[in-house]
Structure formats: C-alpha cells, structure tokens
Design a protein with these regions (language model features):
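Short beta-strand/loop motif that positions the catalytic acidic residue
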Residues: 127-129, 133-136, 140
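Catalytic histidine neighborhood in serine/cysteine hydrolases
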Residues: 28-30, 153-159
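Active-site nucleophile loop of the alpha/beta-hydrolase fold
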Residues: 34-37, 90-100
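Conserved alpha/beta-hydrolase "acid-adjacent" motif
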Residues: 14-16, 141-147
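Active-site catalytic motif of lipid deacylating hydrolases and related acyltransferases
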Residues: 2-61
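Active-site nucleophile elbow and catalytic-triad environment of alpha/beta-hydrolase enzymes
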Residues: 107-125
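Gly/Ala-rich beta-loop-alpha elbow adjacent to hydrolase catalytic centers
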Residues: 66-76
C-alpha cells in the first residue's frame, strides 16, 4: 500500500475531505491534522514537528507528500528547516502569504509570518524539493495567480 504524508488545509483532518478521498483510493495516510492541539502551536513549532516527522519517517526518493492550502504553507516552512525533501511533493492551492480583501472582493487573511516565504524566494534562499509541483484552480481567490507564477519562477517549481 502506498503511503502519503498529508497536510490538509487549516482545520483539516486526515479522515475527511482530501484525506478520505485518498483513503478510498487505497492510500495509507500519515501526516498532521491542522486542528486541535497542533493548530494551537505557534507556526515555528508546527514547522519543526513536520520537519522532524518527514526526516524520521519519509526521508527517501519514493516518499510522497500532498499539502493542501494552509498545509502547503506549513510544508514550505518545514522545508525551510531541512535539506531539500528527497521525495515527490504536490502542493494544492498553496497559501504562500497574505491575501487582501480589496483585490478579491472577499475577506482577506494573513497567515503568521505572511511575507517570509516570498522574501526567502526572492532572495533565492527558499529550499524546495527537486520533485515539486503546484496545482491551483484559475478562480482560487486564496492563491492569486500572479503571486504563484512569481513564486514558481523564483523557486523553479512548476505551477
């Protein structure tokens, strides 16, 4: 049975939504639910916990990570604490910083350390896995296309 390390969006579970769909397709899931006690931790502690788990249990070329929305944000912060992840990574609708309400006609949001990922990418200091892809819908208001395209160009991650 193939195993996937899953990081769902904020408030996400491994047994619902994307996690449930992957389990229904025969995948074994590990990862972090982004709710409960884990969600209450400061971002640096969340990123450290994820980095430690990946290095201890998923550190090989055959490993697979799927990170969705805020889970992708957590993965990228964890990635900044370790060498390039050796496996395959799929980032779905990744949050990579703040989104302002005026540009989208909806309420905006700003995750903790909202500008850090783009700042590291612009400096060429953001470590990314060799096998990483970003997939996002054209109308996903939480992932502005122009920012993701810039992020992809800066990091070499296909969008």
């Amino acid at each position: 049975v193939k195993s996937i390390y899953l990081l769902p969006g904020r408030g996400g579970s491994l047994t619902a939504g994307l996690g449930l769909a992957l389990k229904d397709r025969g995948y074994h899931l590990s990862g972090r639910e982004t709710l409960g006690d884990f969600a209450k931790l400061p971002l640096p502690y969340q990123a450290q916990a994820i980095a430690e788990e990946l290095q201890a249990e998923f550190w090989d070329k055959g490993a697979q990570v799927i990170a969705n929305s805020y889970g992708a944000y957590l993965f990228l912060f964890a990635q900044s604490l370790m060498p390039a992840f050796p496996g395959k990574v799929l980032l779905l609708s990744p949050v990579i910083g703040a989104v302002t309400g005026s540009s989208i006609g909806k309420a905006g949001f700003a995750p903790p350390y909202a500008e850090r990922l783009m700042a590291l990418a612009r400096l060429g200091e953001l470590v990314v896995p060799e096998h990483c892809e970003i997939h996002v819908g054209a109308n996903d208001w939480q992932c502005p296309a122009e920012r993701l395209i810039e992020f992809g160009h800066l990091t070499g991650v296909p969008v």
